[in-house]
Amino acid sequence: MKLPSSIKNWVSITGAILAIFNLATILSLFILSSLFEFGGSYIGLFIYMVLPAFMIFGLLLIPIGMRLNRAQARREEAAGEVRNWPVLNFNNEGTRNAGLIFIFGTVFLLIISSIGSYEAFHYTESVEFCGKLCHKVMEPEFVTYHGSSHERVACVECHVGAGASWYVKSKLSGLYQVYSVLAHKYPTPIPTPIANLRPARETCEKCHWPEKFYHRKIKIEESFLADDLNTEQVIHLQMKTSSKMTSGGMENGIHQHINPDVRIEYKTTSDNRQVIPWVKYTNLKTGVSEVYTDNENQVSQSKLDSLENRVMDCLDCHNRPSHNYNTPQNFVDKLISAGKISKTLPGIKKVAMEVLYPEYSTKDSAFMAISEKVNAFYNSNYPDIVISRKSDIGNAVAEIQNGYASNIFPYMKASWKHYPNNIGHMEFDGCFRCHNDRHATASGKVISKDCNLCHTILAQGTPDSMQYSNAFVPLEFKHPVDIDDAWRTELCSSCHSQLY
């Protein structure tokens, strides 16, 4: 096969060698990864991204070299000269020395650049890179991550996961995020990237999987009323996190939603998935399906048809697994329960709620307001303990400030108000998005909000006046403050979403 004489140059030859070498490497790695699972999770990154980039670069060098040498090749052809391939004469001392320098220099640079690329790759995968590079912008996510149960799971394990395709998506998304930070184009607060998150079955189920059986769990909740005595309320819940195997498959329990024998689909009319007008339940064993619609939030069929049909997974309930912004009533209760704030300080829960209710423009102004208002409260209402319990008051101020700094971020306008937590149903609708006695089938079957579906109450009351259930009959919930039967008809979040 005759080739144009302009291809007989070192640039084109180098490009051809580079392209052929990388093509051979790609094919070899592809065969090894396919047959022997060689290379781990990120071998696809090199097969589909890194090596093809070098191969394309080599292919581009071929026409570049031809272009650079085309004029000289034409002159030689016009003169009747035959253009030969370049010759490396290693008998020539200068050529030999240059060749050795080139070979060893190239090997050395490849080793150094490989180490650098490897370290750079792992740095971009680190928690410090994700959380600290854009410190102010990512501070809310970084701080809440370090207070979560997934603190020892690297960001990329969930946000990227294994495989080259999601790695590419994350880096392309990251380029825009870098631009947004440099150009100050980022929104405040940053919206949760619900549409761009990797499916939970590809990340969460690496550690948590539906087929695994869990025992029921006892959850003890301690809360304090906003009264002068900080009245303590205790409730013992048995959470139905377990399942049981029946002749029809796995049934019952909170995790029925992700039962492998069941598919639950829903449609939402809100970007944050807080409003769900349509739910479909399908028993995959029998093929029987039931459609539930919200009778207080009717949506036209044409509108429903235009909405995404989403299959329920872990993140539809566990939507804040690593970045949970606790509500003030929750983090203050935890501080009092842990003894970090003395529960014998009169009215401390009440004043904490009062100082945490306003929105502050900066963290410094919030800290100053917390200190001033707490001290003013005790100076005005309890002057007799201002001196005798000065250290307790000062410690309470410091702990309220720490709770604020860990959950509320004025610069990014990030707090519980913008990031609802779907676990539970106290401050946010959570479970009650569907379990509200409003979603019903055409035959009248409803999605119940019966408390005992997900948990049973084993004990409740104040520490000195506890009420206990027997082995077979759970307790009926008793609201700490007498609100008659309003708790039966109203959603908890109707009141508890506000500070009190």
Region locations from a protein language model:
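Short cysteine-rich clusters marking metal-coordination/redox-active sites
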Residues: 130, 155, 204-207, 314, ...
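Alpha-helical transmembrane segments and their helix-start/interface "positive-inside/aromatic belt" motifs
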Residues: 2-19, 49, 99-102
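Sequence context of c-type cytochrome heme-c attachment sites
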Residues: 34-56, 62-199, 217-306, 331-340, ...
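Mixed-charge (acidic/basic) macromolecular-recognition segments
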Residues: 308-382
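Alpha-helical transmembrane segments of multi-pass membrane proteins
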Residues: 20-33
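Divalent metal-coordination and catalytic microenvironments
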Residues: 58, 145, 207, 317
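Extended, compositionally biased alpha-helical segments that mediate assembly or anchoring
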Residues: 487-496
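Helix-to-catalytic-loop junction in kinase catalytic cores
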Residues: 159, 208-211, 318, 435, ...
